[in-house]
Amino acid sequence: MAGLLSTFDTFSSRRSESINKSGRGAVIPGQRSTVSVFVLGLSVTDDADKLFIATTFLAHSLDTDKRHSQRGGFLVSLLAMAYSSPELYLTTNGVNADVKYVIYNIEKDPKRTKTDGFIVKTRDMEYERTTEWLFGPMVNKSPLFQGQRDAADPDTLLQIYGYPACLGAIIVQVWIVLVKAITSSAGLRKGFFNRLEAFRQDGTVKGALVFTGETVEGIGSVMRSQQSLVSLMVETLVTMNTARSDLTTLEKNIQIVGNYIRDAGLASFMNTIKYGVETKMAALTLSNLRPDINKLRSLIDTYLSKGPRAPFICILKDPVHGEFAPGNYPALWSYAMGVAVVQNKAMQQYVTGRTYLDMEMFLLGQAVAKDAESKISSALEDELGVTEAAKGRLRHHLASLSGGNGAYRKPTGGGAIEVALDNADIDLETKAHADQDARGWGGDSGERWARQVSGGHFVTLHGAERLEEETNDEDVSDIERRIAMRLAERRQEILQPMEMKAAITVSIMTKMTIPQQ
């Protein structure tokens, strides 16, 4: 029997391995699009010209009249300006099954009177029409930088801070857009300016060169439509982390942004491991958590098999990234979130009200996290030499810190709880509770969740397999008001028949007690 159970425990990981390592077939190339990339030639030496070209690339990438592949090419051209050999940069990091990059040089000819003396050319020929298209008049639908609204002069910044700092400020912001562009597009603008603040405080990004919100949204839309651009940026991070140590200041700043990009879209997976498994509480022995634990073990093997690209599987849209959705291990995720909201106050703002939330496991996680005994790690007792007296005092302190009120946190965000209320039983426990009107429920939407669950009744929600990562943009207070109104409506539906029945009973009793004349 033990062998049979062992086979079942390893089935998920072995099944995934057999699918991913199935028989080799013929390699059939897919369709590839051609993307034009422009690099600076040796004749472009003036810093003002270089900064002008960089802002020209940025402006073209935001031009909605151009195809997204062209706009993506201009962003690649901008990113390549950070390197002394853009061709080598693209050869190292730009190998992609979707696109083929065609490189054009931009040279400066002092004899030319039009297009500011710039000419687009290759080794064999010059491209006059392309030059006109690239450097011709453009109408920006909105300012590129917030400083343009304040009439700030980029040339002045160039004189004060120098070309590398100005170019670095622009390129770093493009990288910051990637942090939220793929996994949380709804919160892109807010997330961008939150991440940018650290770079503004340390002087990396000057105020006059801060992107406008429209610029951020425009770059984000290009990234979402051009997976080849995202792949290039990820490969750049992988190369920095594994193959180089002599990084420039700009590359070090890119690495800092890369730390925000790592494991983007995998917050639920990582939090389940952190709060659900690594806490090593006794609840993990429950049989209904066993399938989810096996699933998580299989996902860990899959994650590690991806090597240095593992932290970017969601951004790269790896075919396996959907397997990491919490809907694939709902009971363990719900339990982990219960532990998390008790142990980490910041996690109380995390969106837990999802369609696959198992309310019973969510409350169980909170209960075991509050239990003073479960907070003590037996594995470290002997190693640290903790005495029984010390453990007793520690339990006393933990119990006093818990407050002893037994209040449970309610799920935040999402529509899962609202959906469940239509089918949930509402316990009208006491007379005082029954006399409370609907206005009282709406005014204190958290009261019902703050009481311990009575009668052993839990609202349990299951289902959903799609990836729903961090969606913190929805107004939680608005959701709570809607939940309170829904509860009030349900309560009124239950109370009205009871009140009518009570009125009829009182009427009958009154007639029976009135003496006949």
Swiss-Prot record:
Q: Where does RNA bind?
A: 180, 190, 195, 260, 350, 354
One GO molecular function term of this record is: RNA binding
Is this entry keyworded Transmembrane helix? no
Region of interest (Ncore), residue spans: 1-404
Q: Which terms in the GO cellular component ontology are assigned? A: helical viral capsid; host cell cytoplasm; ribonucleoprotein complex; viral nucleocapsid
Q: Where in the cell is it found?
A: Virion; Host cytoplasm
Region Interaction with the phosphoprotein, as annotated, extends over 462-471
Organism superkingdom: Viruses
- Annotated region (Homomultimerization) at 440-461
Swiss-Prot/TrEMBL keywords: Capsid protein, Helical capsid protein, Host cytoplasm, Ribonucleoprotein, RNA-binding, Viral nucleoprotein, Virion
> Quick one: where's region Ntail?
405-517
Family from the record? Belongs to the paramyxoviruses nucleocapsid family.
Q: Subunit info?
A: Homomultimer; forms the nucleocapsid. Binds to the viral genomic RNA. N0 interacts with the phosphoprotein (via N-terminus); this interaction allows P to chaperon N0 to avoid N polymerization before encapsidation. Interacts as N-RNA template with the phosphoprotein (via C-terminus); this interaction positions the polymerase on the template.
User: What is this protein's function?
Assistant: Forms the helical nucleocapsid (NC) in a ratio of 1 N per 6 ribonucleotides, protecting the genome from nucleases. The encapsidated genomic RNA serves as template for transcription and replication; encapsidation by N is coupled to RNA synthesis. Forms the encapsidation complex with the phosphoprotein protein P. Before encapsidation, the newly synthesized free N protein, so-called N0, is chaperoned by P.
Any other comment in the entry?
Most abundant protein in the virion. Since the viral RNA genome consists of 15,383 bases,there are 2564 molecules per encapsidated genome.
Instruction: Let me see what the UniProt entry remarks about domains.
Output: Ncore is globular and carries regions required for self-assembly and RNA-binding. Ntail is an intrinsically disordered monomeric domain in the C-terminus.
**Name of protein:** Nucleoprotein
